[in-house]
Amino acid sequence: MPLVNGGKIADDSFVKLAVDTPLPEGGDILVPAERFLGEADALLKRGGKIGVIWPNNRDIAELVPYLGKIAVVALVFPSFRDGRAYSQARLLRERFSYRGELRATGQVLRDQFVFMLRAGFDAFEVKKAADAEAFAQTVKRYSVFYQPTGDGRLTALHRRMQLRHSEGAGL
């Protein structure tokens, strides 16, 4: 699957492992939540970065003690109608201050890309290369937003207030 990271098509250094797949000695891996929680100590001690595939029906609080040690949290969109991963993303960014890669996986669709960015996602697994190119272009399309969200960008109101303040400071 193509990966869009930071608004660009990127190589994915992570290998997805199933619950019963033998652990490689090194390299970056993505493991399912149940495997990570069951083998956290061993996984965190091995060479290479660790990422966790977190289902949207599992409490994100279970992952909080490990956030400083995890390079990637891949949140799953099992259906385009199921938006629980948006809530998980905002919690990770805003409440738990997670600064690692937040990846959207599963049913990642073009028309939801901007909303995913606003929720705090910075990487996206897409089904087709054409979608990856379209996603990369979407990053450039929107620069100002009205609602505050998990991506850390200033809202239109805050930008306007900063501009007025800087103009007033020069008098």
Name these PLM-found stretches:
Residues 52, 61-65, 110-123:
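Catalytic cores of alpha/beta
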Residues 35, 56-58, 79, 108, ...:
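Active-site-proximal loop/turn and secondary-structure-junction residues that shape catalytic pockets
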